[in-house]
Regions:
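N-terminal "mature-domain start" segment
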Residues: 41-71
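Surface-exposed amphipathic alpha-helical segments
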Residues: 2-8, 63, 167-199
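Alpha-helical interaction segments
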Residues: 23, 52-54, 130
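Conserved polar/disulfide-associated segments of primarily extracytoplasmic proteins
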Residues: 6-14, 40, 65-178
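Hydrophobic membrane-insertion alpha-helices, especially the h-region
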Residues: 14-38
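Extracytoplasmic/secreted proteins, especially bacterial periplasmic and envelope-associated proteins
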Residues: 58, 102, 106, 185, ...
Length: 199
């Protein structure tokens, strides 16, 4: 009788061990599944096409799109507190002799009087699109103060990146603007945007 009781207890213990192992495996599988769903939701995109401007690109699905002049296309992450992360594309006429660096200088001249503490960080870096087209990449920073006088907030340093290319008699300016504290974690979104861009 003692042997039978011990045998039943061993069997019960073996079942418990398998139950524990199976529970751990299921829990890990569910965590991985949840992580996969989260990554999929964060990286979900929507397609934007504008045949008149010759632009086709995928942008983050949960961002607000705006197509009002002076830009062809602008999307903003409205879930951000403070400065809203922005990606925009605008075009300007460009003559045969116009260079991307001249457009970059003109942007600096236009922005300096309208933004606080505007400063060019890096200039004249070459950026190559997936179709091997060369363009100019420049980075800058400025201070953003919320225009609403009823909101008391600390000014935010904004970091911007411009990619300028000249095609078909027009300069195409792709701009990325983000809170400087979030630049490193947000630049991957801009890189995915550029990788999907067809001009």
């Amino acid at each position: 009788m003692i042997e039978e009781f011990g045998g039943a207890q061993d069997e019960y213990t073996r079942q418990q061990r398998w139950a524990h192992i199976l529970t751990i495996i299921v829990a890990v599988a569910m965590l991985l599944y949840g992580l996969n769903l989260r990554i999929g939701a964060l990286n979900a995109t929507q397609l934007y096409e504008n045949p008149e401007a010759g632009v086709r690109v995928s942008y983050p699905a949960n961002w607000l799109i705006d197509e009002v002049a002076p830009y062809v296309f602008r999307v903003r992450d409205m879930s951000r507190i403070g400065f809203k992360t922005t990606i925009q594309i605008e075009t300007q006429p460009a003559g045969d002799q116009t260079s991307a660096s001249a457009i970059m200088s003109q942007l600096d001249l236009n922005r300096a009087p309208t933004t606080d503490s505007y400063d060019r960080i890096a200039n004249n870096d070459i950026y190559i699109f997936s179709d091997e087209t060369e363009s100019l990449r420049g980075e800058y920073a400025f201070v953003f103060q919320d225009p609403n006088p009823f909101l008391q907030s600390i000014p935010i340093v904004v970091r911007g990146t411009d990619i300028i290319t000249i095609r078909g008699g027009q300069a195409i300016i792709i701009t990325f603007l983000v809170d400087a504290n979030l630049y490193d974690e947000s630049i991957a979104t801009f890189e995915r945007f550029l990788a999907s861009l067809e001009l």
